[in-house]
Amino acid sequence: MLYWLGLVLKSHIFLFNVLRYITFRALIAVIVSFLITLVLSPIFMRKVTALNRLYGGYVREDTPETHSKKKFVPSMGGLIIILSLELSSILLMRLDIAQTWIMAFTVFGFAIVGFIDDFVKLKNKKGISARSKMLGQIIVSFVSASLLYFVMHIDTHIYFPFFKSLKLDLGYFYIVFVMLILIATSNAVNLTDGLDGLAIVPAMTTAFALGIISYVAGNSILARYLEIHYVENAGELAIFGMAVVGAGLGFLWFNSFPAQMFMGDVGSLGLGAALGMLAIMSKQELTLIIAGGVFVVEALSVIIQVSVFKITKGKRVFKMAPIHHHFELNGTPEPKIVVRIWIISILLAIFTIATLKLR
């Protein structure tokens, strides 16, 4: 919206010319999304805390007993994150390109699935069934993948990091590939969201790294110089990536230890879908594995735990999965686990950006 305002007013007021630049709008996105989250969160917390107390509170069943004290901490704080992202993208991204609207739809769709689950948990602690939850994600991801393929006509090649020209064309199977990325990423973020402040910082660092790469991929000169695949209008995705950073900072203000609110499934599923879409639309699907390495490890720990338990009929690799609970049961304080994972996520983001030259 502001992009077009800049085009209209630049001939009358020179300062409005800066609204044409992606870098300036990305900076504004950080500030706007941060302020929206910071201002609305206290109001939201008061409302949801009252609901939590009315229905007896909620804490995940698959957590250590020490988490029982968090039962009245308001969940669904991710609503504010998603609202902030949607408003920031509509305000600051170009509205004449498919990327803006497909991103907005995908994030909103996954967030709705998470919100329904969170809302049901207020009365029924188990939430909606796993089958219903997965069905919702499949429907949203299929629509998003179809929009990418049939409307945006996205390139169906997969480009491999560290290689200049290695690529694989999936053709129609790219639709299924997109669905797998969106569902896997959203659920991986959901699994990671188990300690105060744990999931939001890796989400921010992943979005930042993918935002930087999106900017490069959308700039024909930089893309040619660094020998990565050029994607028309991908630079606009950098604005969304920076909005995730701003909204994340605002949320972390209240989510850091001891947490005053949690993001809930509405936040984790929505954020996961956002990260997946950033990677997909910038043609960095495989780079997401590096940038979001924390989420990959957390998800793998659950897969390993469940698989070994079923195969051996009762044996476990970890004391509890996801792996952050294993560290917790080993006696490592929650804040120390969280900060260490933050450090790892920052290093992964740095390495992800470095892959631009490592090819």
From Swiss-Prot:
Protein name (record): Phospho-N-acetylmuramoyl-pentapeptide-transferase
Cofactor: Mg(2+)
A Pfam family that the UniProt record links to this protein: Glycos_transf_4
Catalytic reaction annotation: UDP-N-acetyl-alpha-D-muramoyl-L-alanyl-gamma-D-glutamyl-meso-2,6-diaminopimeloyl-D-alanyl-D-alanine + di-trans,octa-cis-undecaprenyl phosphate = di-trans,octa-cis-undecaprenyl diphospho-N-acetyl-alpha-D-muramoyl-L-alanyl-D-glutamyl-meso-2,6-diaminopimeloyl-D-alanyl-D-alanine + UMP
Class of this enzyme: transferase
CDD domains noted in UniProt: GT_MraY
Main subcellular location of this protein, as a coarse class: membrane
Involved pathway(s): Cell wall biogenesis; peptidoglycan biosynthesis
Listed NCBIfam families: mraY
PROSITE patterns: MRAY_1, MRAY_2
Top-level taxon of origin: Bacteria
